[in-house]
Amino acid sequence: MVDWTEKYRPASLSEVRGNDTARDALAEWAETWPDHREAVVVHGSPGIGKTSAAHALANDAGWDVVELNASDQRTADVVERVAGEAARSGTLTGGSGGRKLVLLDEADNLHGNIDRGGSAAITRLVDDAPQPIVLVANEYYEMSSSLRSACREIEFRDVSKRSIVPVLRDVCRREDVTYEEDALAAIAEQNAGDLRSAVNDLQALAEQDRTLTADDVVMGERDRTEGVFDYLDDVIATHSAREALQAAYDVDETPDDLLSWVADNVPKDYRGGELADAYEFLSNADVWLGRVRATQNYAYWRYATDNVAAGVAAARRHDHGGWTRYGPPSYWRKLGSSRATREKRDYVARHIAETAGCSMATARNDVLPFLRVLTHHCKNRELTVAMAAAYELDTEHVAFVTGSGETTNKVASIVADAEERRTDAAVDHSEGAFAGAVREDNTDEDSAADETTDGDEDTGADSQRGLDEFF
């Protein structure tokens, strides 16, 4: 099963529809690039042909393409290694004129530690690269000002309904789909300027029967919901991509959850090649969901839904008969069975983070494994008591960290000693706070207090000695 948006991706800029002005500006930028050597930012809404136009441009010019998008990690090191090296080495290995097109997709989505230093590295790259560079963005002003100022800007606008309909008509002719004009108009209207989504909907509705009427088009608000098991019947147990897409809109589940349900249950009904095709569609859906997580652009949910619903249904070739018992995703069952363990882990990590002033992730991934080794089965009792005192751990959490039995006397005595240490430390702190209120003429009491304080300081020092050895 071939994705029609890929099958009919424009091979030349002349085939790009709905953005003639932007298309011509991109062609002019490429033709004059040796004179100005500027990078260009192509920006606009999702699904209107920005990335396709960049690939079509490279095809026209005979340039190879090196691409980085939001599915890739884009730290400074990665940008330098992949895009930077490609830009510098293109003169030796590239296509026409020895050039490569460096394509940085979703350039407006560089996030925190995930893409650490990526924006600065891209800015340096566009300033110095001896190869043409195209940056693609949905939100132009989400890019850094320094990066915007270093590039030429070309805006792609939403594709109008009258531009979408001829594209759908052309796809129908190539795919031998009999169609009603009103159906194409309805798809174009429904997809509000998103050409890619319009082609996806056309494929979902027309691929099976090769006919398309206005009544077939899913339109308007859906005012009913169905259960997830009904949805699985519509997607897995039938051949109709159209019904599967309708069911996906009717069921009250997110695309992430639908993917989990279908991925776990489709092997119960599909065989051989049809199973392989179904998993290819699920893989495509997962790619789109990854882009949602990377960019927080939930418009991409639509493309994931097309794959996980209509794509999987279209992959079915045979009716295997019988009744299939569907069940919830095994991943969810595993999460349920491990919930108690995860709750204990997070409790300990939270107390470590609050005490040490680090993040939960650092506490969970770096500090906690270290503590487990040092306190394994409570063999180093002093350290285990110090840990329990410092992080205020009770019996179940000491047992979790050390791997010891929760009901053993050893763990109970460690928790009791830790509680005593915390109490002693609190008393010592309170006495220090009121030391100035002791009467000057009560020298005997002062001496006694001094002795007590000295003893408590020794105890306080003991309570910290074990923790010092952790760090």
Swiss-Prot record:
Residues bound to ATP: G44, S45, P46, G47, I48, G49, K50, T51
Domain of life: Archaea
Single GO MF descriptor: ATP binding
Cross-referenced InterPro entries: AAA+_ATPase, ATPase_AAA_core, P-loop_NTPase, Rep_factor-C_lsu, RFC_lid
CDD domains: AAA, HLD_clamp_RFC
Disulfide pattern: none
Region (Disordered): 422-471
SUPFAM superfamilies linked: P-loop containing nucleoside triphosphate hydrolases
Biased composition (Acidic residues): 442-460
Keywords for this protein: ATP-binding, DNA replication, Nucleotide-binding
UniProt biased composition (Basic and acidic residues): 422-431
Entry's Gene Ontology BP terms: DNA replication
Quaternary structure, from the entry: Heteromultimer composed of small subunits (RfcS) and large subunits (RfcL).
PANTHER family: CHROMOSOME TRANSMISSION FIDELITY FACTOR 18, REPLICATION FACTOR C SUBUNIT 1
Family the UniProt entry places it in: Belongs to the activator 1 small subunits family. RfcL subfamily.
Function: Part of the RFC clamp loader complex which loads the PCNA sliding clamp onto DNA.
UniProt protein name: Replication factor C large subunit
Organism for this UniProt entry: Halobacterium salinarum (strain ATCC 700922 / JCM 11081 / NRC-1) (Halobacterium halobium)
